């Protein structure tokens, strides 16, 4: 029995040593394979053409650049495109297959079936405050309304830029704007915004803090207001609380993968006058408004030219946002 026990122990020890040797051999082999694989990647990477999201390439040329209608262009096999449109467009077209028709037309421009998504919205104002932009490239169709031209330009500013906003309690606190990128954004069915600038003793400058009738009116009965006041000065603010909300917002920079197509209107809205829009660049496409089918056909024709002045899902804040008009 003693000899059998020793033999068993010896067998176990030999098995452990052999297993350890096999595992070390496998580990060394895998290390060798991984090393050769990484070395191969390092050698071929300079020759592989891939997108660079960190480089800022400014776009030069005429502000009224002419876009050529072309069927040739980049093959967007790995990109997605979202087209946002007002619900009225779908109602006017009244065709259950219209999205499939457009998908087939986008296919002729290099966009594979399934890469283009269509999403309607009921109210552009609500959409602009928190736009859900899901795709690599996002194109928003915005119908021009001559009764709210100012609102439209501010809506475009909200959609084309990233904003960080926080609620304001104007009944308890004074507020000041810290920089040109800091704005107060009011939205509602009826927004009348009044402000009273304060001195260092919190006394009103040209107004009485206890009398809102002496406040300066910066907006009256509007649906959307982006208020810009003198930086570094406290203000007491008054708004119609029952019909309006106000938030303290900071413009972080442009959404480079977003473009707006203005549908109709005599002129394209100019948002580049805002000193926080950097650089001062605008690309305009001018086509007469007819029917929604005509609008969508035009978008299909020029989609690749529009995409070329956008950045795919870029997070850089250096380049311009672009505003288009049909």
Curated annotation (Swiss-Prot):
Residues that coordinate or bind Ca(2+) 1: 95, 206, 214, 216
PTM entry text: N-glycosylated. The N-terminus is blocked possibly by pyroglutamic acid.
Compartments reported by the entry: Virion; Host endoplasmic reticulum lumen
Residues reported in the UniProt entry to bind Ca(2+) 2: 177, 228-229, 301
Function: Calcium-binding protein that interacts with rotavirus cell receptors once the initial attachment by VP4 has been achieved. Rotavirus attachment and entry into the host cell probably involves multiple sequential contacts between the outer capsid proteins VP4 and VP7, and the cell receptors. Following entry into the host cell, low intracellular or intravesicular Ca(2+) concentration probably causes the calcium-stabilized VP7 trimers to dissociate from the virion. This step is probably necessary for the membrane-disrupting entry step and the release of VP4, which is locked onto the virion by VP7.
Similarity annotation: Belongs to the rotavirus VP7 family.
Subunit field text: Homotrimer; disulfide-linked. 2 Ca(2+) ions bound at each subunit interface in the trimer hold the trimer together. Interacts with the intermediate capsid protein VP6. Interacts with the outer capsid protein VP5*.
Protein name: Outer capsid glycoprotein VP7
Native source species: Rotavirus A (strain RVA/Human/Japan/KUN/1980/G2P1B[4])
Higher taxonomy: Viruses, Riboviria, Orthornavirae, Duplornaviricota, Resentoviricetes
